[in-house]
């Protein structure tokens, strides 16, 4: 099985107006590109990235190769997704079987929001609850105090609601992260933290595991 053609399909997925206004401090895009990987066997694999299509040189590097050439590869994961899709279809297996043991049988769905003022954060949580969501992931940045945001959420969220923060490494290191994370773990609605410090700081992650109760994980 060889990849013979890659078709980029550019989509425009707009934010709701209130989110767009709150997201001015991020250089984000409403453009999403879906890739269809065609093969000489007729199978089609699907990949995706946020933003415009990758350049033709990168896409061309996949042409003429087998999807199996990209197992645990060093290419763009957005494109390797399509290769795993193809491998799973070719073998008649779910793609996770090519990656290791199954961890869970389901994946939680949640609301998403950029970092906002505590007042707007509370209002956004109420929108999420009204639409049936019981959890959300919020970008956490220095624009607003994440502790104040969390207290605002705690005041309006139903008892079973959960919030997880995505810092994208913005707490930098353990010394800066620990005081903030220790305050967050006192707030019941906070259930998880994504990449509080830089991913390569192995010793820092080990120390967080020793000292922090809140679950945390890589981006």
What are these regions (language model features)?
Residues 116-128, 174-182:
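Short, acidic/polar
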Residues 133-135, 189-190:
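A structural motif
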Residues 145-219:
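Catalytic core of soluble alpha/beta enzymes
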Residues 1-45, 50:
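Structured beta-strand/loop patches that form or line metal/cofactor-binding pockets in enzymes
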Residues 105-120, 139-140, 168-174, 217-219:
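Active-site mouth loops of central-metabolism enzymes
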Residues 81-116:
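Glycine-rich, aromatic-flanked loop segments that form ligand/cofactor-binding clefts
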Residues 5-6, 35-94:
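Metal- or metallocofactor-binding catalytic centers and their adjacent structured scaffolds
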């Amino acid at each position: 099985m060889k990849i013979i053609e890659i078709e980029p399909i550019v989509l425009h997925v707009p934010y709701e107006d209130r989110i767009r206004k709150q997201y001015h401090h991020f250089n984000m895009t409403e453009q999403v590109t879906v890739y269809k990987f065609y093969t000489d066997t007729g199978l089609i694999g699907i990949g995706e990235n946020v933003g415009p299509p990758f350049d033709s040189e990168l896409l061309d590097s996949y042409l003429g190769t087998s999807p199996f050439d990209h197992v645990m590869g060093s290419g763009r994961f957005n494109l390797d997704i399509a290769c795993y899709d193809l491998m799973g279809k070719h073998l008649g297996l779910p793609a996770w079987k090519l990656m290791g043991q199954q961890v869970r049988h389901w994946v939680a769905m949640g609301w998403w929001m950029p970092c906002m003022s505590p007042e707007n954060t509370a209002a956004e949580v109420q929108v999420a609850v009204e639409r049936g969501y019981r959890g959300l992931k919020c970008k956490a940045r220095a624009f607003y105090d994440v502790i104040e945001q969390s207290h605002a959420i705690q005041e309006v969220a139903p008892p079973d609601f959960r919030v997880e923060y995505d810092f994208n490494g913005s707490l930098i290191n353990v010394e800066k992260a620990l005081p903030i994370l220790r305050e967050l773990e006192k707030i019941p609605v906070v259930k998880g933290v994504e990449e509080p410090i830089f991913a390569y700081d192995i010793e820092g992650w080990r120390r967080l595991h020793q000292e922090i109760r809140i679950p945390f994980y890589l981006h």
